[in-house]
Amino acid sequence: MKQRTTRFNKIYAMQLVTIFLGFIIFGISENIKGPAIPRIQFDFALNEEQLGSLLSLNALGYLIACSFTAILVRKFGIKATSIMSFASMLLSGIFIFISHAYPAFAASYFLMYIGNGMLEIALAILGARIFVKNVGTMMNLSHFFYGLSSTVAPLIATGMMSVQVFGHVLDWRGMYLVMLSLSLLPILTALRSTFPGDDMPAEQRTPFKELRRDPALWWMVLILSFGVVSELAVGGWLVNFLEKAYRWDTVKASGLLSVFFLLFSVGRLVLGPVTDKIGFTLSLIIFSGFSAICTFAALAGGESWAFLFAAAGLGIAMIYPTVMAFIAKRYPNGSDTAITFTVTMMGLGSVIGNYIIGFVIEAVKKLYGVNDPNALLRGLQAGYGFIGLCALLCAICGFVLYRFLKKRGELI
């Protein structure tokens, strides 16, 4: 009996190492591009439109990967699919390093985002299968590692691009090779692990038609979409807002963004047990509502209340992992399909959301007129107000879902 328990603990430990390393790699691959993009643009002489097209193409690759990963999981199993996603990241690092023509580089970058999309779905499915106790705590702990690597990745990437190896500067190509080669670590742990759920007969799996008829899943799509738009938009717009609206210098504005990410990571590390205690649905309402209140209060209070922009990170950090925990609990036999559908729809929603923010800023600026000195400030306030509105809509959708589930006695 003791031998069986020891073996089980070793298996579970390897599963945890694989998923935690996976989230670290995911955070690295998504966030090393910031320092590299200006150098990539210079080396290939790309204009802003070409650079935008490159990033849009990669977003498309990410969505494509999200859509077919569940099929790979059903056909080959989650272990093989996870290894494939890590391997594609590793290969893309090698191809980026040897790509000196733009078409070859664009194809290599596209492969990286295919791997990125596969990895997001694979990690979510792994979490849903592995974490059967304290689901909220463990989901948030896993995503803490994503937040941690996201915070340090740009700093490491910046430093690594100036490192010399055998008399040659690594630059951005070498940096991508080294950072993405870290994908080898979770490949090794995955090879030594076994994962539950692959042996489940097809007839026991909840079919997509049945999932699609569940209103709760559609509310989850809306909650996740609004939550992720509010989360990701901060990284893209906060520094810009502070520099142009309050005339902060880049160092000071970036410092507040770093505090946002710090609180974001702390929230996932510390508040996970709260979601298990009070329930996932109620947690979604409280945390997204808190983020919305902080954002609107920061806008209303002006520069002296700008610290509340960072405080919003505590609330919005909880949305993604809590939604994954909800799906794992509600659809134990259909979590693969439910996660794939929800994340793919969220991806579409987040692309649309970022376009809307830019549109709102420009529309309000034009409304005030080119000659109005406050036009830019009002436009930026309106755009950032939309970020707060997304958090508020996330809370409202959570409230509607709470009432729906409570009436049916299905609260989670």
Which functions belong to the PLM regions below?
Residues 33-34, 214-261, 265:
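Extracytoplasmic gate region of multi-pass secondary transporters
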